């Protein structure tokens, strides 16, 4: 199975968080772009993007949306919890004879056995194994892109550091653990870059990041940007967190708190959130300096002052 040129791409999940940047860079590179969506009527997409209705119930219901349209590649950027839909989409892509898939490999790496055994990963493993098995049989080719954290999302939603001041930042294992994060725009750029080099990127996994940052570093910038804000912290030991998470899980408590604590342990406590080596250069991604990260934090804090900011009198 070989393909020297990819020009016609379909996106599953193109109306979600990664959609705008992915569509932007694919169009910029001159590719024909279509988007699968469950709700074509309400999809708000650029005029030069084809919108295709999709039923993700099964591969059989989804395949007709892909067949006969000449797609060379499919980019799967469905909701990070839509694991069943990801497997369905991959099978439908095989049924339609699509050459290349970029599956949803954007989160943490599964290389560490302890992490792979965590409950939140057990739903991701079937997706990964399914892709690898299909590639092994020559049914499809793939390219994986591991991005670490989505930079915009973890800053917007107070996930990495509580920039809004609404709740304390949960500082993991001292707060000096380096973490890789990639801006949504750079993820779109990387996806487009991969598809422009189909032969070089066949059945490979790449690592990229826009910035490497620590919680203490970002907290420091935030405090500098808003000296009157509290930016409270809660120190957490990820080993203690994961022990409690396993206890809850084994007692049948499968709540968001448990999932969150497993993720925190995997990302911070086990160093799995930092990529010591990346493929930035190959993908055309430029890593930010500390000064650029500081400017980004200042911009965000100034635009949305923390709720507990004390306004100077006078």
Give the positions of each predicted feature.
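Oxidoreductase cofactor-interface core, primarily capturing Rossmann-like NAD(P)-dependent enzymes
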Residues: 2-47, 57-60, 96, 109-230, ...
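Conserved Rossmann-fold cofactor-binding substructure of NAD(P)-dependent oxidoreductases
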Residues: 50-72
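NAD(P)-cofactor binding segment of oxidoreductase domains
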Residues: 68-103, 115, 119, 123-130
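A hydrophobic C-terminal alpha-helical subdomain
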Residues: 239-314
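Short, glycine-/small-residue-enriched flexible loop/hinge segments at domain edges that mediate gating
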Residues: 102-110
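A generic structural motif
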Residues: 105, 231-242
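Short, amphipathic alpha-helical "lid/cap" segments that border enzyme active or binding sites
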Residues: 63, 184-192, 290-298
């Amino acid at each position: 199975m070989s393909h020297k040129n990819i020009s016609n791409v379909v996106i599953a999940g193109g109306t979600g968080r990664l959609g705008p940047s992915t569509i932007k860079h694919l169009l910029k590179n001159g590719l024909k772009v279509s988007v699968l969506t469950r709700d074509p009527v309400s999809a708000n997409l650029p005029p030069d993007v084809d919108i295709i209705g999709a039923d993700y119930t099964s591969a059989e219901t989804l395949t007709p949306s892909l067949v006969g349209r000449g797609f060379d590649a499919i980019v799967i950027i469905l909701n990070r919890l839509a694991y069943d839909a990801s497997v369905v989409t991959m099978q439908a892509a095989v049924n339609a004879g699509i050459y290349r898939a970029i599956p949803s490999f954007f989160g943490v790496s599964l290389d560490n056995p302890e992490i792979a055994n965590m409950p939140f990963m057990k739903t991701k493993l079937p997706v990964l194994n399914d892709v690898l098995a299909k590639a092994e049989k020559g049914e499809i080719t793939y390219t994986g892109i591991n991005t670490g954290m989505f930079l915009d999302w973890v800053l917007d939603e107070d996930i990495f550091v509580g920039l809004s001041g609404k709740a304390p930042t949960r500082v993991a294992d001292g707060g000096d653990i380096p973490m890789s994060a990639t801006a949504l725009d750079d993820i779109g750029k990387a996806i487009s870059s991969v598809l422009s080099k189909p032969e070089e990127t066949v059945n490979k996994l790449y690592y990229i990041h826009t910035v490497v940052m620590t919680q203490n570093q970002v907290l420091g910038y935030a405090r500098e940007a808003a000296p009157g804000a509290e930016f409270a912290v809660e120190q957490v030991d990820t080993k203690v967190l994961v022990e409690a998470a396993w206890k809850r899980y084994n007692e049948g408590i499968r709540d968001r708190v448990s999932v969150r604590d497993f993720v925190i342990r995997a990302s911070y406590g086990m160093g799995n959130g930092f990529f010591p080596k990346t493929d930035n250069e190959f993908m055309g991604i430029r890593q930010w300096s500390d000064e650029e990260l500081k400017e980004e934090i200042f911009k965000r804090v100034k635009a949305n002052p923390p709720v507990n900011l004390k306004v100077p009198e006078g």
